[in-house]
Amino acid sequence: MEIHLDNYLPEYPSFVSGIRRAPDRGYSLTPAQTETALMNALRYIPVELHEKLAPEFMEELLTRGRIYGYRYRPQGDLKAKPISEYKGKCIEGKAFQVMIDNNLCFDIALYPYELVTYGETGQVCQNWMQYRLIKKYLEELTEEQTLVIESGHPLGLFHSKPDAPRVIITNSMMVGMFDNQKDWHIAAQMGVANYGQMTAGGWMYIGPQGIVHGTFNTLLNAGRKKLGIPQDKDLRGYLFVSSGLGGMSGAQPKAAVIAGAASIIAEVDASRIETRRCQGWVQHVTDDIGKAFSLADEAIRKKEPISIAFHGNIVDLLEYADKQGLSIDLLSDQTSCHAVYEGGYCPVGVTFEERTELLAHHREDFCALVDKTLKRHFEVIKRLVARGTYFFDYGNSFMKAIYDAGVHEISRNGVDEKDGFIWPSYVEDIMGPELFDYGYGPFRWVCLSGKPEDLIRTDHAAMACIDPTRRGQDMDNYNWIRDAEKNRLVVGTQARILYQDAEGRLKIALEFNRMVRDGEVGPIMLGRDHHDVSGTDSPFRETSNIRDGSNVMADMAVQCFAGNAARGMSLVALHNGGGVGIGKAINGGFCMVLDGSERVDEILRSAMIWDVMGGVARRSWARNPNAMRTSATFNENRGEQYHITLPYIPERAFIHEIVQTSLNKTV
């Protein structure tokens, strides 16, 4: 067996007009580092081609800030095909090719030519040489081998066993003292670090649908907790305002409409607005702020849902609302603030095109404008909150970016970020206590046949597995899957997102595998977002409602990754950064190919429970009440095979008295 790139020069691809391109990421290497970067890229290429490609790669590095190897990108759109159309020696090898191509197709990817799936910087891998080599490896992969991927680089095939993962991925796992944006930027330019975000580098993205259910849950529960909306009502008559219509943030208008709300979503990039308009995810587009609020006001009076895309800056929109005394019920932000100085956040007074020019030629000026805008953004939110608006950070590192811009007033303890910020994140206030602490999270699947009828069958099967009377969350999830087809959520592969707890996920997974076994549907890929109960440690998002001091620890995410590998998930991935940025999160996920076998049933029975309950156990040990109750019930129901350590809770007044008495003695 010999696997390498072929000894011929592919034709340079033609770039399709109208397809978004990533901005210049910035070149800041020393001459010695530049030489290393060039050598790193050329090590994929047969020596005979170096003379031709070295100048080409050098030009990419200087003008794009990365070596993408555009020449090695296949021509045209990389749409995911049915699994039967891929070459491979095992079903997993074929299945992962479906997932990779879906992440990079024009309908899905934010910057397809730069391998960015979503989130401004989330890449499948670093360059097109890696893409081609990964595909070759997946075609050769057998059920007794594991493919190892390190920051996009296919390290090789290694002998394993059928019950081991077929693919193990890590992305940007920086050594501690270098785990920061500056050193990562150097490593990325040199071609040794890939920002996989979550499901981009984890090969499990399902389009903006992947976050619609979570956004729907967040908005609905925000309305119940903060606006007094009854359990059986929705957000009709209320206004939600936010920003961002990209690969993740694009879920906001769709989720708001499903939840019944009127929504205005600001977006500076006209192409992203057009993408959502063509998909039917926004109903109205305007660059007139007054018209945007007028349309929303009419829908609010009629108690009808509406989605409005405002082409402009969110700060302008909010300052207008503040000056006019307009009411906003729910307010958030989903700009890519994990990459706030790399183009993820556009300064006020600057067009999207001007932002791209500033990034390329005047980066310091751009960064100064970003800081200035963040401060204005903070001030206007503060005024709106004082008038009754409920603002929540959507886990995009927005409040951390404000803090880093010099606004230490946003820090809860006035000293640092360890105790969080003055406004809650959506995990802190809503997602954590209402969903994660019970084990509910973003379970998902892809019908690898590509047949819509397979997705419909799985929708019905999943719905039959849910008891809507068990909990309020189950009723919401039942209604979600009942209406999923009607809501036209699919973009790219035939896929579905559905929040479920541990028992629900296992029940659905086993039913799906039976359906594959009995020939009712084709093979299925199971997975989840890394943004889940157990998958991610980040004090700025997923573990922001952990208050025992362990919110800065990443043991949970690493243990989840290792446990899923040990139990035989088809693919396991572990990344640095997630949705909040390098050094601010450790996150992991999995893919599990359902082939109908009894072997897969056994893996599911072990791995699906672990993947969820490891996180519930950690949340319980942090003394989260709902997680403690969930863990106690789990011990009662599954005590023969499992047992979670439960905390004893001392009285707070007793502890306070002990501490104060002891400290007073030392004064």
How should each PLM-predicted stretch be described?
Residues 100-105, 109-113, 186, 192-199, ...:
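Catalytic cofactor-binding cores of redox enzymes
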Residues 290-508:
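Core active-site phosphate/anionic-ligand binding loop and the adjoining beta-turn-alpha structural block
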Residues 257-259, 322-327, 348, 407-411, ...:
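Short, solvent-exposed amphipathic alpha-helical segments in soluble enzyme
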Residues 140-145, 260-261, 327-330, 383-390, ...:
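Structural alpha-beta junctions
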Residues 197-220, 224, 236-239, 245-303, ...:
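Catalytic or ion-translocation cores adjacent to nucleophile or general acid/base/metal-coordination motifs
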Residues 295-304, 309-324, 328, 626-665:
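C-terminal domain-closing interface element
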